[in-house]
Amino acid sequence: MLTALVYVAAALAEIAGCFSFWAWLRLGKSSLWLIPGTASLLLFAWLLTLIDVSAAGRAYAAYGGVYVTVSLLWLWAMEGVWPDRWDLGGATLCLIGAAIIILAPRPA
């Protein structure tokens, strides 16, 4: 359960950080948006180090499914765009892949 919470927190931190750059470069917002955005990206990187896995790449691969799902929630909640069936189908496939990576039996 803690792993899932860390992954969701990391996804929110990464998306918020990246969105600050999007807002600055694409929406014409002040460059001051980059200050909390950069802090958010640092938080994202730190949070992924809390995942209890033997290899960083495995943590990142499993995180990918969570990131896609949280990104679609951001799309809906923050940008007012409802994900279509292709978005939802793709997210489902990503979550299945992430679950396989996270839950696979591995030697200790």
Swiss-Prot record:
Its main location: membrane. It is found in: Cell inner membrane. Keywords: Cell inner membrane, Cell membrane, Membrane, Transmembrane, Transmembrane helix. One of its GO terms (cellular component) is plasma membrane. It is a multi-pass membrane protein. SUPFAM superfamilies: Multidrug resistance efflux transporter EmrE. The chain crosses the membrane at residues 5-25, 31-51, 62-82, 88-108. InterPro entries: UPF0060. Pfam families: UPF0060. It comes from the Bacteria. Belongs to the UPF0060 family. NCBIfam families: PRK02237.1. This is UPF0060 membrane protein Msil_1658. It comes from Methylocella silvestris (strain DSM 15510 / CIP 108128 / LMG 27833 / NCIMB 13906 / BL2).
